[in-house]
Amino acid sequence: VRESHNSRSMRGIASIVRESRPAAGPIAAAQLDAGADAAKDAMWGGAARLSASGATTMSDIVTESAACPAHALEVPKLEALPKGAAPQLTCYQLGPHAAPIIPGRRDRAWMDATSEHYAYRCLPLSMANTSGWEITSPLDFEVTWNGNQDINAITARAPGVDPNVLRALITSHFAHGILTFHTGWLFRTSPGWGLWVRGAPNDAKDGIHALDGMVETDWLPFPFTMNWRFTRPCTVRFRKGDPFCFITLCPHALLDGVAPRRASIEDDPKLKADYVEWGKSRAEFNKLLRDGDPAAVAKKWQRDYFQGKAGGGDAPFHVNKRRLKPIE
């Protein structure tokens, strides 16, 4: 990964992993790092590109003019964008071995394991799971950290995989138990928009933790890495199809302009009345459940939020299922 002041500032953001396994036993992380650049050149080659067009919603992935080099882009104020225009996400594929990108999936194994799948009744969980795109592992691999802080402390296994492929995908560039992955993509977003890069929401992996990053992809002319930090010495596994990175568009240029305001609930009588009514309704329904009321037991849970209903009316805008578009 090319280093600069900006890339160093993004290292803490990293949140994507890539995988592979060596053909003959573990490969030390130092060896992985040493051969990574040459292997990536062989793997990812020139300027292959993948994009889709026809933006009608925020989730569209659209083509950006190849005639506009990254370093020449100017970032206009967001108010200069057409009203209602969907932000753009262009995914420049850096070669034939870039990891698959798919719309975020709702399901989680731990949510499936809850009684009657009740975790899916929490709409914010499901919406978070699907509010972005997953970058997924193309194969099975495992990595081990021995607890030391040097770059040689991480070894990797990917039986049957060319060691050069492994070296192109994972390194121990930052040491300290941090595993670095290359996605095989360079992303470009609309002016003022960046990518929030992280692990898949609500999807923990024992022994290792995905690091979050906010990347200014509206101007960045090189790819970012995805980094995971071991939480203890152990071996962790990624299976083919597991998400190792999750990307979500974020209007980062607007955030510094947000001015949080303290207010009393008494300042908004309508909001207070709706809040009090919600609390009363919830308490009554939960009491009926505890008492075994047949109607409440049959209903199981209140669905007002799921259905976008509040204060006796419908929400002006409500979504209970994401429909993000895939790359075509």
Where would I find each of the regions flagged by the language model?
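Ser/Thr/Pro/Gly-rich low-complexity, intrinsically disordered segments
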Residues: 6, 19, 29, 39-40, ...
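Residue-level detector of intrinsically disordered terminal segments
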Residues: 9, 42, 56-57
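Residues marking helix boundaries in flexible regions
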Residues: 14-17, 28, 44, 62
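Low-acidity, Ser/Thr- and Arg-rich intrinsically disordered low-complexity segments
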Residues: 2-11, 15-21
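Residue-identity detector for glycine
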Residues: 12, 25, 35, 45-46, ...
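Aromatic sugar-binding surface patches on proteins
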Residues: 220-226
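Non-catalytic terminal segments and appended small domains
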Residues: 54, 58-220, 234-328
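Short alpha-helix capping/helix-loop boundary micro-motifs
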Residues: 228-232
